[in-house]
From Swiss-Prot:
This is 3-isopropylmalate dehydrogenase. It comes from Saccharopolyspora erythraea (strain ATCC 11635 / DSM 40517 / JCM 4748 / NBRC 13426 / NCIMB 8594 / NRRL 2338). NAD(+) binds at G272, S273, A274, P275, D276, I277, A278, G279, Q280, G281, T282, A283, D284. Gene3D superfamilies: Isopropylmalate Dehydrogenase. GO terms for molecular function: 3-isopropylmalate dehydrogenase activity; magnesium ion binding; NAD binding.
Length: 347
C-alpha cells in the first residue's frame, strides 16, 4: 500500500506518529510518503496545496491526515485552501463518520443503550459548494447569499453508498435526515432518490426524520439509528453530536471517500489541531488510530482493520479514563494489542 501522510498542525504530528506505529504492526510493508502541508509551510512559502503536490497525492492508495489549523493563520485560509480543496479536487463525495459507544466509555446521555451508527454525509455539494456572494457590502443594503447545490448525480451516488453500507450491516436500516417540509426542492430530490434506490435493496428498511427531530432522538434514543444519509450541512452538524454522545470527538474517526476509487480517499480524526496542548504529549491518538482502521477497510485490508478496531475496543474497556496515559504510551499499548491473544479472539 502506498500511503500519503499529512501530519499537519498542532497535535496532528503527535497522533499521526502513534497511528503509524499501529499501522506498522498490521501492514508492515506500507510505503509512506510525508507531506508538510499546513500552517508551517504556508508561513514559509505562502503555499497551501501546490499543483505538483496534488499530482503526487493522486498516485497514492490513500491519505492519512492529522489535523490542520493554527491561530497564527487567518481563519478560513487553511480550511478553504487545503482541506476543502483536497475534498473537491479528489472528489471526496462521501464523508463517512462512524459513531460507536465502546464498552468502558461514558456517554453524557443517561441511558444511551447500544450506540453503533454510521453517518454518510454528502461531501461536495450543499451550501459548501461555494455558490454565493455579497452585494452592496458594508452598506445598510448588504445582501449575502449562500446557495445550496444538490444535483441528481451527487445525491444518487451518496445514497447508493449509504444503502450499500446499510445492506452490509446486521440491522440493515437506513434513515434519511433532511428538512423536506421547508427545503421542499432539495428535500424532494433527496426523498425521490432514496425511494428509487430503496427498490434495489428490499432487505434494507428505510425511515425519514427531519434534522431537528434527529437531534432530539440522538440524545433521547440514539440506539434507533443504524445508517444515516444526509446532505453536507446537516451531516456536518449531526456528526459532531453523534461524536459527543459516544465519548467526544477525541474518539471520533472520519473518512473522506471517493467511492469510485479514481482518487485516493483521505482519513482523519475529527478533532482539531488543539494548539493549546500541542507538544505536551498528552493528546489521545485513539481517533487517529480508528481512522487507520477505516483506511484499512477501504483499501481492502479488512482483517487488519478488525484487529485495529478490536485493539481500540479492548484498550477503551480496560484503560483508566481519568488518566489514559501519554500520547506515546497509548500508541504503544495499541501497537502491542493488535498482535495480542486478546485481540485475536475478538477480531
Amino acid at each position: 500500500m502506498r500511503l500519503a501522510v499529512i501530519p499537519g498542525d498542532g497535535i496532528g504530528p503527535e497522533v499521526v506518529a502513534e497511528a503509524l506505529k499501529v499501522l506498522g504492526e498490521v501492514v508492515p510493508d506500507t510505503e509512506i510518503t510525508r507531506y508538510d502541508l499546513g500552517a508551517a509551510r504556508w508561513h514559509a512559502t505562502g503555499e497551501l496545496l501546490p499543483e505538483s503536490v496534488l499530482g503526487e497525492l493522486r498516485q497514492h492508495d490513500a491519505i492519512l491526515l492529522g489535523a490542520v489549523g493554527d491561530p497564527s493563520v487567518p481563519s478560513g485560509i487553511l480550511e478553504r485552501g487545503l482541506l476543502l480543496r483536497l475534498r473537491f479536487e479528489l472528489d471526496h463525495h462521501v464523508n463517512l463518520r462512524p459513531a460507536r459507544l465502546y464498552p468502558g466509555v461514558k456517554s453524557p446521555v443517561s441511558d444511551p443503550g447500544e450506540i453503533d451508527m454510521v453517518v454518510v454525509r454528502e461531501g461536495t455539494e450543499g451550501p459548501y459548494a461555494g455558490n454565493g456572494g455579497l452585494l452592496r457590502k458594508d452598506t445598510t443594503h448588504e445582501i449575502a447569499t449562500e446557495v445550496s447545490i444538490n444535483t441528481a448525480f451527487g445525491v444518487e451516488r451518496v445514497v447508493r453508498d449509504a444503502f450499500a453500507r446499510a445492506a452490509s450491516r446486521p440491522r440493515k436500516h437506513l434513515t434519511l435526515v433532511h428538512k423536506t417540509n421547508v427545503l421542499t426542492h432539495a428535500g424532494s430530490l433527496w426523498s425521490r432518490v432514496v425511494e428509487e434506490v430503496s427498490l434495489q435493496h428490499p432487505d434494507v428498511t428505510v425511515a425519514y426524520q427531519h434534522v431537528d427531530a434527529t437531534t432530539i432522538h440522538m440524545v433521547t434514543d440514539p440506539s434507533r439509528f443504524d445508517v444515516i444519509v444526509t446532505d453536507n450541512l446537516f451531516g456536518d452538524i449531526i456528526t459532531d453530536l453523534a461524536g459527543a454522545i459516544t465519548g467526544g470527538i477525541g474518539l471520533a474517526a472520519s473518512g473522506n471517500i471517493d467511492a469510485t476509487r479514481r482518487n485516493p480517499s483521505m482519513f482523519e480524526p475529527v478533532h482539531g489541531s488543539a494548539p493549546d496542548i500541542a507538544g505536551q504529549g498528552t493528546a489521545d491518538p485513539t481517533a487517529a488510530v480508528l481512522s487507520v482502521a477505516l483506511l484499512l477497510d477501504h483499501v481492502g485490508q479488512s482483517e487488519a482493520a478488525r484487529r485495529v478496531e478490536a485493539a481500540v475496543a479492548f484498550d477503551l474497556a480496560t484503560r483508566d479514563h481519568s488518566a489514559p496515559g501519554a500520547t506515546f504510551a497509548i500508541g504503544d499499548r495499541l501497537a502491542a494489542l493488535v498482535s495480542s491473544r486478546e485481540v485475536a479472539q475478538q477480531a
